[in-house]
């Protein structure tokens, strides 16, 4: 039997040999052909993969340069930030970080992330605040593991900027952003409100939260880090005297987070909303960069869709989107858009 010379014939022969059911004596030359063919095929794939990677890298760098120029040329920058930006900064609600601070709760109740645990119907307010005081402290009063927000500030600190965010972790202010140029639409881990609510005020919770975590056995280090005891087991409840109640009606206090119609939009919330509206009004028709960072589709009506609409209504505006996935825009905006998929921390 002659050895086929044409490449397609070689493929057919080798595939046939690889599917043989009954053992046969194989000509060593066939094995050599198989080896040569597989090597050539792998080499082709590697070359193609490298070419695609190089093309992707060049396009990515071109977009990053385009974004840099858009920031430099902008009369104003409107930052719209979602949960993905804090994830990039290291504020993750699963995995090692969850196990470190909530391993006892996970072992008792079976939930696997902080977010799910926040909805658990604990039997007592003492245990509820045992969980939530840890949740608040590590996500609001501890610094983010990575300097993503600080790096972002360096990009825009010389610009006329405003921040619109659905995040509730206070990372922008901790990084040094001007608090008068921010609008936290969905609340703040650092604020409590009446659970009814009987009135529209919010209350700073830092001192009480620190007492709650310390009562469970934690120590607050000089740098603000929460340290677990070396030998003693952590408590999962707080003393009853630390459970906060409304100073006006006596109802239990709760988080100032937008979950339903009971969310309190206090005086500070309305003032921030007015400042944001005024900023947008003052920059109509100007070179505005709408910079969307880590925004998904849970609440697209707050940042994503308005940014699209305002860009479409202003031919001088630029819409930029950085997201780990789904960095995209409507076809109508492609000539005004810069969409980059990736982790903001690595750009």
Regions inferred by a protein language model and the residue ranges of each:
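Conserved catalytic alpha/beta core of Sir2/sirtuin-type deacylases, generalized to analogous enzyme cores
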Residues: 2-347
């Amino acid at each position: 039997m002659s050895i086929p010379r044409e490449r397609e014939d070689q493929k057919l022969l080798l595939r046939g040999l690889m599917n043989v059911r009954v053992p046969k004596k194989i000509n060593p030359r066939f094995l050599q052909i198989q080896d040569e063919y597989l090597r050539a095929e792998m080499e082709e794939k590697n070359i193609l993969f490298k070419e695609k990677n190089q093309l992707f890298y060049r396009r990515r760098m071109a977009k990053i340069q385009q974004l840099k120029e858009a920031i430099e040329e902008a009369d104003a920058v409107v930052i719209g930030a979602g949960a993905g930006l804090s994830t990039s900064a290291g504020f993750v609600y699963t995995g090692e970080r969850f196990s470190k601070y909530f391993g006892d709760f996970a072992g008792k109740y079976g939930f696997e992330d902080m977010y799910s645990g926040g909805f658990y119907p604990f039997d007592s307010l003492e245990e509820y605040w045992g969980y939530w005081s840890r949740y608040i402290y590590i996500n609001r009063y501890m610094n983010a593991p990575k300097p993503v927000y600080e790096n972002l500030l360096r990009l825009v600190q010389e610009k006329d900027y405003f921040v619109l965010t659905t995040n509730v972790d206070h990372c922008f202010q901790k990084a040094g952003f001007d608090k008068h140029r921010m609008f936290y639409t969905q609340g703040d881990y650092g604020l409590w409100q009446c659970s009814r609510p009987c009135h529209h005020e919010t209350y700073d919770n830092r001192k009480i939260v620190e007492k709650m975590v310390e009562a469970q056995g934690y120590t607050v280090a000089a740098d603000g880090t929460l340290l677990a005891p070396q030998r003693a087991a952590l408590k999962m409840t707080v003393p009853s005297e630390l459970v906060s109640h409304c100073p006006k009606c006596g109802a239990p206090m709760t988080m100032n987070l937008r979950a339903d119609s009971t969310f309190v939009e206090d005086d500070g919330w309305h003032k921030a909303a007015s400042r944001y509206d005024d900023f947008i009004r003052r920059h109509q028709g100007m070179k505005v960069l709408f910079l969307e960072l880590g925004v998904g589709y849970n609440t697209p009506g707050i940042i994503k869709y308005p940014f699209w609409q305002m860009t479409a209504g202003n031919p001088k505006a630029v819409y930029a989107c950085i997201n780990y996935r789904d960095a995209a825009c409507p076809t109508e905006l492609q000539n005004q858009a810069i969409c980059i998929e990736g982790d903001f921390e690595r750009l």
